[in-house]
Amino acid sequence: AEHKAADGLFVYDSKNVKDLQIGDYVKVNGTISEYYGLTELNASSVTKLSDKVEAPKASTVAFPKTDTERESLESMLIAPQGDYTVSDVYNTNKYGEIGLAASNKPFLNPTVKGLKGDAETGAAYQAELDRIEAEGVYLDDGSSRNFLDTKYPDNADTPLPYLSNDQPVRVGEKVTFTKPVVLDYRNSAWRFQPTERLTGDNADAQPVTFTSTRTDTPDLAAVGGDIRLATFNVLNYFSTTADETGCSTSNAYTDRDGNPVTAKNCDVRGAWDKANMERQRAKIVKAINNLGADVVSLEEIENSAKAASSVPASFKGERRDYALSTLVDALNEQAGEGTWAYVPSPQTVPDLDVEDVIRTAFIYKPAKVATVGETRILTDSDAFNGKNGY
């Protein structure tokens, strides 16, 4: 790619750069190497020079769409031009990174467009994969810090980059670059790095602003009714805790202080003990009751017939619905008796050996909607069969 960017090179050095600041003019001796796709200079010495030189200017370029173009700008200071949209916030709370699409729309899972190898939809599937490859880039925080790692005691005191209570970052938001960034390659992905690590104490170093595209009240055409639908992942809501099944504390996800919080490699998933179960349930109940929805599709709720959970003899419903019933009871305790009901499982269900310990489910408000007929569990379609790879 043709550009006028000042040449840049990543310098790896853990000893000699602590006293340097942005703008210093230095002489670096070392050895060039390729480290997992990033060209870097492994410094043996760094000398600060007294000469006065002009600071490098950022190159104003559109996002390079090919690896060849990106390589020509690797480690260089650029001022990104064109449209950028938030497309992924999955690892923002862990690594302080935000996935961007270099276009005016976020990416879709390619299987939304089609199925790999399918005669009719395979081309659409591949087209979305190609778009992700051409337009995908991460906005990083200038650090490799894992905010969930307990070996960093200052994690609890370091605010997550880019986020604040009054400025959430949502998929679909427009991204505007206000400061230059460095085009970087690490962890198998191209990234925009700020010129210094974002710590919460240097908010002015944040190189972007976000513009929300969400309206407070969506504009809806006049319809004959007003039913609100929502979906909510309860993230392994189980009716039995890990400590009740005798799971070892070595098989637990822990908080920053090393206390067990959720199950890992246990006979159940979800909360570690009663206190964490109540904390999980309280968050779910508050969130769902504040959705304003009339029908909610739930994901990752316990299949009580399959999981190693205790279903009391007093429960008169289908065994697989027990955890679901406890969540509905908790919702009604806060919202009022009878506010919520769940759609019961059908009498005919798949064999337990082909079911998972988690499932999907529907809850609804009887005052707004009613069920018609018996439910069905769809198992005869490739689209619902994970063993087929989609």
Task: Give the ranges of each region predicted by the language model.
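Sec-exported extracytoplasmic/periplasmic mature domains
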Residues: 28-37, 46-51, 83, 87, ...
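Extended non-catalytic accessory segments flanking core domains
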Residues: 1-262, 280-281, 369, 377-390
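N-terminal, active-site-proximal structural segment of metallo-dependent hydrolase catalytic domains
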Residues: 200-361
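Extracytoplasmic mature domains of secreted/periplasmic and thylakoid-lumen proteins
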Residues: 339-390
